[in-house]
Design a protein with these regions (language model features):
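Low-complexity, acidic/polar, glycine-enriched regions of mature
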Residues: 1-181
Length: 181
């Protein structure tokens, strides 16, 4: 594996066809419910000193879940993402420096439902490589855990023998394939 190095600042744009933003949350205390957003917009700037800065957004309406349409509608509604009022989820990072092995810790602000909170994501920066068509590509894979209640997502139902139908800790999974501008 090589780490991303540059001789001058470079901007990389997310390849929408090869990038994803997913989430997973405990369901009925025994399984994980997973979903993703298909419309991911990301930009990564690699500074001369190797510092990495990420800005990104996803369109909430692009949510995809392996569930009935009424559940998708519930997720898009006011109990969860409130897509009509808040159509985007955004993230803006502070500069971060990858380690020699490509591992990286990214600190930034995540905004959902009009609420911004600091988030720390960990992951890996891979590349660069030249693709068969002459473009320079890299990848950024990140994971973070948030408490959905901090973003106003408090909906839940109690289970008959204790516990809640939906967990509060949500794992965010970001996979960005990046193309140099």
């Amino acid at each position: 594996m090589t780490t991303l190095t540059t001789s001058s600042a470079r901007t990389f744009t997310g390849d929408r066809d090869h990038s994803s933003f997913g989430f997973a949350v405990r369901h009925m205390t025994v399984s994980m419910f997973r979903g993703s957003f298909g419309d991911v917009d990301a930009r990564v700037v690699i500074a001369d000193d190797g510092a990495v800065e990420l800005t990104g957004a996803v369109r909430v309406e692009s949510i995809s879940v392996q569930s009935p349409a009424d559940l998708r509608a519930h997720l898009l509604g006011a109990d969860f993402f409130d897509a009509a009022t808040h159509p985007e989820i955004t993230f803006r990072s502070a500069p971060a420096r990858p380690a020699a092995d490509g591992s990286i810790e990214v600190h930034g602000d995540l905004t959902m439902r009009g609420v911004s909170r600091p988030v720390v994501a960990t992951g890996t920066l891979l590349g660069p490589v030249e693709d068969p068509f002459g473009a320079t590509r890299a990848a950024l894979e990140l994971r973070a855990t948030i408490d959905r209640r901090e973003f106003g997502m408090t909906w839940n139902l109690p289970l008959p023998k204790g516990g809640d139908a939906l967990g509060t800790q949500v794992e965010l999974l970001v996979h960005l394939e990046l193309v140099a501008d």
